[in-house]
UniProtKB/Swiss-Prot annotation:
Residue positions where Phosphothreonine is found in the record: T46
Topology term for the membrane: Lipid-anchor
Record region (Disordered): 1-68, 89-125
Organism (species): Oryctolagus cuniculus (Rabbit)
The name this protein goes by in its record: Protein-glutamine gamma-glutamyltransferase K
Amino acid sequence: MDGPRSDMGRSDVSRSDMSRSDMGRSDMGRSDVGRCGGGPLQPSATPSPEPEPEPEPEPDRGSRSRGGRGRSFWARCCGCCSCRNAADDDWGREPSDSRDRGSSSRGGRPDSRGGGVNAAGDGTIREGMLVVTGVDLLSSRSDQNRREHHTDEFEYEELIVRRGQPFHLVLFLSRPYESSDRIALELQIGNNPEVGKGTHVIIPVGKGNSGGWKAQVTKASGQTLNLRVHSPASAIIGKFQFTVRTRTEAGEFQLPFDPRNEIYILFNPWCPEDIVYVDHEDWRQDYVLNESGRIYYGTEAQIGERTWNYGQFDHGVLDACLYILDRRGMPYGGRGDPVSVSRVISAMVNSLDDNGVLIGNWSGDYSRGTNPSAWVGSVEILLSYLRTGYSVPYGQCWVFAGVTTTVLRCLGLATRTVTNFNSAHDTDTSLTMDIYFDENMKPLEHLNRDSVWNFHVWNDCWMKRPDLPSGFDGWQVVDATPQETSSGIFCCGPCSVESVKNGLVYMKYDTPFIFAEVNSDKVYWQRQDDGSFKIVYVEEKAIGTLIVTKAVRSHMREDITHIYKHPEGSDAERKAVETAAAHGSKPNVYDSRDSAEDVAMQVEAQDAVMGQDLTVSVVLTNRSSSRRTVKLHLYLSVTFYTGVTGSIFKESKKEVVLAAGSSDSVVMPVAYKEYRPHLVDQGAMLLNVSGHVKESGQVLAKQHTFRVRTPDLSLTLLGAAVVGQECEVQIVFRNPLPITLTNVVFRLEGSGLQRPKILNVGDIGGNETVTLRQTFVPVRPGPRQLIASLDSPQLSQVHGVIQVDVAPASGGRGFLHAGGDSYSGETIPMTSRGEA
């Protein structure tokens, strides 16, 4: 395996170059690397670097003239409503300006243009003109604006506010303000700002404009003017350039643009008029402001959890989020709509179609990038994408979901990360999971295009849906993992959870696919002597068996299955399934079901850590009043968590005689040496059990997935944590395997504590225990989480976390600047080694 890359380098897998601004493009063919049907698609070859698009030239808006006098845009607009003035109301020409007003900071910032301009554009300041000598946007993290707008945790010095809520600023003038003076604030975004599209905002002080913006004087004292500015709850989100214009009888003055005066505007879940409004403060604290969370994985019976550093307030992350919208070519005028924004994000977090953030890889070969299990957060991924412009290798569902949570929370949408256990992937829109067997009930893998993932991770975000009938507001599913196309591109959602719950698969967006993931049935088909297939068993409670997320204001797991589906087996749940299936490609699938099921079967697997032997058992129960003879076939194989299976490495055939009302078990022992050569990611195995009851003809069928667990890292804080002071953490790991782990890499990350750091530690011997220590300097106070992971070719999915309560620096809150990108990889010697 190649050494880890600190900057994640360039994408190693080819993608079709389809960066278009519209959402409806044709579906391009995709390779299906490392898996057979029913799984996420991924690219397959090394790309040539994608050149950065050339910026479109901005039209010269100062070139028009009438009667020898140029006309500025602002001068052509009425001060009270921004409508066009009459042709005679010409106060002068705006100087030509071709600066870029893109929303992200990936490129260089424009320079200030000097000392201001008058109406004639010659820089002459005449007596009586009102000159703005300076602006204070009160943008410090400790200032009123940032605190009131809940943006004080952003590691930025610029002003960051939320729409629909007033903010304050101060103008410094060349003379005292007079009531006859006319002042207008201007905000511009994009390369070609237009008033009609909301990308050029003119706000006359003391009056509102037709777009809902207002600016009022709150205090005039000497040569200082305090203003309160109110944005509409539907304002475009992004980074705006801010300038000021004044008009007096002596002439017009324009303050030159200063990069320090850029203003970021975000969605506002605290504003009742904003369609992203959330009416629960606890939810806002957790789903918008919480910088870390839990992501669940594994199987329903063996749930694992990992802490993820969302890091939405880290320096550079906000610019990365806005760069994603820019890279997609999303029109600025549509960036005030959270439905459109979240749909674009679901397309752009994966690299297919658009050269987005992450390259998906389910092949098991990650030598040209980072194993998805090695990531501990989103910050390193997003900063690499912002810095290089290239897709980052590699991601799987929990990585796509973790990054999506970061992006949507950063932009102001209440978002949570959701795990669905036994998640179906319906490839033929039948809204059922179809599994095919031969005459002896051995799986026909070449026909099993549908798959059931052990788990799948996606996102819920909260918003109203004005594009749907009433009753579908609230949680909306957004899934950035590239599985199937939607309108020709790899995106999914937003989809109302309420429509999923009731099987209303005709509601947009992508409801049929999401419904099948959580509430379809497993249908078992057996090949008959004439080659046709017959339904022999329908498993109604096998899909979407548990849907969970991190609980609000807690590290506990919350079961949210009930918001996605009615109680399993209830009349409402059956109606939802059959309503949805009626709109699928096999609407009559439930018409040919057989009954007479008096033998029940249950499968259990022993909980074991990787490196240990284990057993699986099948429990049969005869619920009839007569004897039953059951012929059982057990097939054991390894499986990717996406439901794609490897070859069968162990099988067993048994005949079991059950007395009336009795139970019996069939046990299959599995030694470490038997499963170790076959293991793939996540350490999961699949037991296919099929059987035939001699007396009644009943067919038994069951698929049971289980996994061997991986060990955790142990983190210990050595001393107190204070802003600006060096702190030390100790990491201890014991290798559970009898083999050497080679090219071991640790990752360390924590918002407000540690920028993403990569540590190369070499090899770790079989059953060896190692200890290493690392120092870090906290930059923000409060409760924080430091997260670590370990990865090697022989062992992955190893991680740990520690809570760090950071005290403020003496004398204040003690924020420190935390700029800079990820650390490059370093070779770290272990402080101690020992045999376990």
